[in-house]
C-alpha cells in the first residue's frame, strides 16, 4: 500500500502540465525511494520527454535490482524511447535476469539507441557470481553481433 507521501507525489504527477512540473513531480516520487513507485516511474519513461525520463531512470536505478521484474514485464513495445530508457536501467543495474531482454533488444529492435544500450548491458552484465557458462557465451555472442551492426553507435558500444 502506498504511503501518504507517495500518494501525494502521484497526484502531483497527475496534475503536472509542464515539463518543469513533470520533472519536479518525478523527482518527488523518485526521492521517496519506495519500490511501489517503480511502475509509475516506468510509465513516466514513455512520456516522450527526455528530462522527465532521465529523472525517472535515476529513480529506478536507485531502487536497485528489486525493480528488474517490473522492468521486464512493463516494457512498452510500441515506444522506442521508453524501451531505450528501460534497457538503460537494466544495463546499469547489471542484473543477469535482464539477459533475455537485452539479447532480444540487440537482435530485433529497430532503434539504434535501444540496441546501443542493450550492447552496453550485455558487456557489463554481472556474471561474477554466476556459474552459468551459457550466460557468458550468450553475452559474448551478442557483443559479436553488435560489432557487425549497421549503426556505428552500436558497434562502438561493443568495442568500448
Regions picked out by a protein language model, each given a short descriptive name:
Residues 6, 38, 68, 98-99, ...:
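Core helices of alpha-solenoid repeat scaffolds
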Residues 1, 19-34, 43, 51-66, ...:
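Structural detector for internal amphipathic alpha-helices that build alpha-solenoid repeat scaffolds
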Residues 1-4, 11:
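Short, Lys/Arg-enriched, disordered terminal segments
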Residues 8-16, 40-48, 70-78, 101-109, ...:
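Alpha-solenoid HEAT/Armadillo-like helical repeat scaffolds in large eukaryotic proteins
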Residues 138, 142-160:
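Hydrophobic secondary-structure block in the mid-to-C-terminal portion of proteins
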Amino acid at each position: 500500500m502506498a504511503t501518504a507521501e507517495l500518494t501525494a507525489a502521484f497526484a502531483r504527477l497527475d496534475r503536472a502540465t509542464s515539463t518543469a512540473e513533470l520533472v519536479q513531480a518525478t523527482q518527488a516520487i523518485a526521492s521517496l525511494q519506495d519500490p511501489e513507485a517503480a511502475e509509475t516511474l516506468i510509465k513516466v519513461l514513455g512520456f516522450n520527454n527526455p528530462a522527465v525520463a532521465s529523472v525517472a531512470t535515476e529513480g529506478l536505478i536507485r531502487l536497485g535490482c528489486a525493480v528488474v521484474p517490473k522492468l521486464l514485464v512493463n516494457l512498452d513495445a510500441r515506444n522506442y524511447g521508453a524501451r531505450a530508457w528501460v534497457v538503460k536501467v537494466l544495463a546499469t543495474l547489471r542484473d543477469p535476469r535482464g539477459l533475455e531482454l537485452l539479447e532480444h533488444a540487440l537482435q530485433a529492435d529497430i532503434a539504434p539507441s535501444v540496441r546501443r544500450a542493450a550492447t552496453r548491458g550485455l558487456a557489463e552484465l554481472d556474471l561474477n557470481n554466476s556459474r552459468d557458462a551459457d550466460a557468458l557465451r550468450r553475452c559474448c555472442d551478442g557483443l559479436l553481433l553488435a560489432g557487425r551492426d549497421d549503426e556505428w553507435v552500436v558497434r562502438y558500444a561493443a568495442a568500448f
